[in-house]
C-alpha cells in the first residue's frame, strides 16, 4: 500500500510517496517517489491545461542528421567551398539541408521552407525564412564546381569507409538515367539530351547518372553525371581513371578490390584500360555474340553449392575475349529460366491473338465492300509491328499473299523448332568473364556478379517518389544539375548507412519501411502558463507515442539525445 510521507530538509518539509510490502514476513519500503514541496505539489495539481501544443517531425530528420554528423558533412563541404563573410549559413549547411530534405520528404526548393518549419531541423539547423528561398539555395549551389564536388565526395566516402568500417573487396559500377522537364530550346544545359529513357518518356531530355557502390550496405562511394544520349561504353571510358583514383584513395589494398560492371560497358579499349588498372573485374558478355558458349547444355555443367546458389549450374572455360584470354563462366539458373519462359509464352500468345484477329479480318474482306481496301504493303507493315519485340520474328513465319481479286490474305505459322532451340540455348543462361583465375571459384564469380542488385536497388530508391527521389529537379543548367545529383547521392549514402546500422543491430528494414517508421516519431512541445512568482512559461517536450519497433529503432540510434530539454 502507498502512503504519503513528510521529510524535513534544512527545516523545510518535502513529501514522498512510499510503497511498503512485507518481505520475508517483515515490512519493507519497495518504492519511493519524490513529490516535492507542498507548493510544487499544489502548482502541479492546479496547473491549467497547456496553452499551446506544437508538433514537429522528429525521427526521420534526426536519424539522418546523426549520420550526417558522423560523416562531418558541413565541415567537409566548407573546407572545399569556404564561407563568404561571417554572416548567414554556409554552403555546407545549405547542401546538408538539401540532402536531408531528400532523405525525409523530397520537395522543390520553393517548398523546402514549409517542410523545414514542420521538422525538428528548424531547431538543429536554425535558419530564417529569408535564408530558405529558392534564390538563396541557387546562389550557394552556384559556388560549387565539378572539381569541388569530386573532392568533397571523395573525402565523405573516405570518412564513411573508416568510421563505418565498410568492406571494399567487391565494388559495383552501373548507370541509369532520369528524365527532366528542360525545354527543348534550353541551350544552356548540355547534359540533358534525348535518348533511351529507362523509365519511359523518350520524348523528354535525359540526365545520365553512374554510381560506384559497395556490396556492404549499398553505400555509394562515387557518382558521375553524363549526357543522357551517351552510350554506357563511352561513359565508362571517360570515367575509368576516376574510378581507379577513387579506389586508390579509399583503400591501401586496391589490388584486392574486384570491380563488377555490366555488358553495356564492354569494348576492347575499355577492357584494355581495366587491364592496365589496379583492380580485378567481373563482367558479362552479350549472348548473341557467343553462340558457341550458349550451345553448352546444362548436362555439361557443374551444379554449384546449393546453400549459396540453389538451382544454378556453371561451365567454366577460357576464351579470348576483347583481345585477351579470360576465365569464362556459362551459367544456367533454373529460376531465371522459369521466369523467362513464362514471359516468352505470354508474349507469344499475345502475338498469336493479334495475328489471328488480323487474319480473320482480312478473310472477311470482299471486293464489293465499301471503303478503302487493305493493301499488301499495309498488311506487311501491320505484321511487322505485331512481331516487334525480342525473338518474335524468329518464332513466327508470316506471309502476305494477294488473291485473284487483288485482296491481301495472311498466312502465319508458329515455329516450334525455333522455340525449342531458344529454350535449349539462350533461356536461363548468362555468360560471365573475369581476370580472376584459379584463385576464384565458380561460386565466387557468380556471387560477385549477382551483387549488382545492390547498385540496382540504389537506382530504384532514387526513382521512388517517397524518399530519396531524384525528382523534382527544377534546375536548368549543367552546373546546378551536377550539384543536385551530388546531394541526392549524398542522401542515398546517409540513408543506406542508417539502414546498415540498424541491420547490424538485428533490425532489417528497407529504406521505405525504415523511414515510414522514423517519420511517424514526432517531437511534441506543450507550453503552459508561467507559474506563480515566475515570468517564464513552462515548456514540456516529449516524443509522441511509439510502437515497439519504433522504440527499438530509437534506442539503437540514440535519438533521445536530440530531444529538446
Q: In which residue ranges do the predicted regions lie?
A:
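Conserved glycine(s) in the ABC-transporter nucleotide-binding domain "signature"
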Residues: 1-93
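Anion-binding and metal-coordination hotspots
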Residues: 3-6, 12-16, 24-28, 78-565
Amino acid at each position: 500500500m502507498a502512503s504519503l510521507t513528510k521529510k524535513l530538509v534544512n527545516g523545510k518539509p518535502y513529501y514522498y510517496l512510499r510503497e511498503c510490502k512485507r518481505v520475508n514476513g517483515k515490512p519493507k519500503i519497495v518504492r519511493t517517489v519524490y513529490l516535492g514541496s507542498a507548493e510544487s505539489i499544489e502548482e502541479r495539481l492546479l496547473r491549467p491545461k497547456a496553452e499551446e501544443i506544437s508538433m514537429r517531425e522528429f525521427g526521420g530528420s534526426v536519424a539522418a542528421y546523426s549520420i550526417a554528423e558522423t560523416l562531418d558533412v558541413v565541415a567537409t563541404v566548407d573546407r572545399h567551398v569556404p564561407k563568404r563573410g561571417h554572416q548567414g549559413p554556409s554552403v555546407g549547411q545549405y547542401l546538408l539541408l538539401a540532402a536531408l530534405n531528400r532523405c525525409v520528404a523530397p520537395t522543390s526548393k520553393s517548398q523546402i521552407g514549409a517542410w523545414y518549419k514542420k521538422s525538428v531541423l528548424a531547431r538543429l539547423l536554425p535558419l530564417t525564412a529569408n535564408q530558405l528561398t529558392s534564390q538563396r539555395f541557387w546562389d550557394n549551389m552556384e559556388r560549387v564546381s565539378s572539381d569541388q564536388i569530386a573532392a568533397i565526395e571523395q573525402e565523405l566516402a573516405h570518412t564513411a569507409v573508416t568510421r563505418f568500417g565498410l568492406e571494399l573487396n567487391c565494388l559495383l559500377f552501373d548507370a541509369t538515367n532520369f528524365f527532366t522537364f528542360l525545354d527543348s530550346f534550353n541551350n544552356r544545359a548540355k547534359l540533358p539530351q534525348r535518348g533511351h529513357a529507362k523509365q519511359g518518356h523518350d520524348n523528354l531530355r535525359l540526365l545520365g547518372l553512374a554510381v560506384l557502390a559497395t556490396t556492404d550496405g549499398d553505400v555509394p562511394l562515387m557518382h558521375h553525371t553524363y549526357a543522357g544520349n551517351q552510350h554506357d561504353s563511352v561513359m565508362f571510358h571517360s570515367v575509368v581513371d576516376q574510378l581507379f583514383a577513387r579506389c586508390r584513395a579509399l583503400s591501401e589494398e586496391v589490388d584486392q578490390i574486384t570491380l563488377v560492371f555490366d555488358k553495356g560497358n564492354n569494348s576492347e579499349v575499355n577492357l584494355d584500360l581495366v587491364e592496365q588498372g589496379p583492380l580485378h573485374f567481373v563482367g558479362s558478355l552479350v549472348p548473341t555474340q557467343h553462340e558457341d558458349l550458349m550451345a553448352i547444355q546444362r548436362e555439361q555443367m557443374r551444379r554449384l553449392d546449393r546453400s549459396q546458389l540453389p538451382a544454378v549450374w556453371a561451365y567454366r572455360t577460357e576464351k579470348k575475349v576483347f583481345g585477351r584470354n579470360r576465365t569464362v563462366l556459362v551459367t544456367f539458373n533454373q529460376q531465371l529460366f522459369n521466369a523467362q519462359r513464362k514471359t516468352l509464352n505470354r508474349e507469344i500468345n499475345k502475338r498469336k491473338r493479334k495475328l489471328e484477329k488480323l487474319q480473320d479480318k482480312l478473310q472477311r474482306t470482299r471486293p464489293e465492300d465499301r471503303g478503302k481496301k487493305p493493301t499488301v504493303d499495309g498488311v506487311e507493315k501491320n505484321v511487322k509491328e505485331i512481331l516487334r519485340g525480342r525473338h518474335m520474328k524468329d518464332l513466327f513465319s508470316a506471309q502476305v499473299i494477294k488473291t485473284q481479286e487483288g485482296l491481301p490474305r495472311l498466312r502465319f505459322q508458329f515455329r516450334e523448332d525455333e522455340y525449342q532451340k531458344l529454350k535449349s540455348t539462350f533461356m536461363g543462361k548468362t555468360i560471365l568473364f573475369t581476370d580472376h583465375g584459379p584463385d576464384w571459384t565458380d561460386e565466387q564469380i557468380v556471387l560477385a556478379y549477382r551483387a549488382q542488385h545492390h547498385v540496382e536497388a540504389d537506382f530504384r530508391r532514387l526513382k521512388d517518389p517517397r524518399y530519396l527521389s531524384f525528382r523534382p529537379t527544377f534546375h536548368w543548367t549543367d552546373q546546378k544539375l551536377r550539384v543536385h545529383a551530388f546531394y541526392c547521392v549524398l542522401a542515398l549514402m546517409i540513408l543506406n548507412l542508417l539502414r546498415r546500422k540498424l541491420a547490424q543491430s538485428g533490425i532489417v528494414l528497407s529504406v521505405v519501411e525504415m523511414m515510414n517508421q522514423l517519420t511517424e516519431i514526432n517531437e511534441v512541445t506543450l507550453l503552459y502558463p508561467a507559474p506563480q512568482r515566475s515570468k517564464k512559461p513552462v515548456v514540456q517536450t516529449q516524443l509522441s507515442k511509439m510502437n515497439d519497433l519504433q522504440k527499438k529503432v530509437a534506442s539503437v540510434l540514440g535519438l533521445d539525445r536530440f530531444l529538446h530539454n
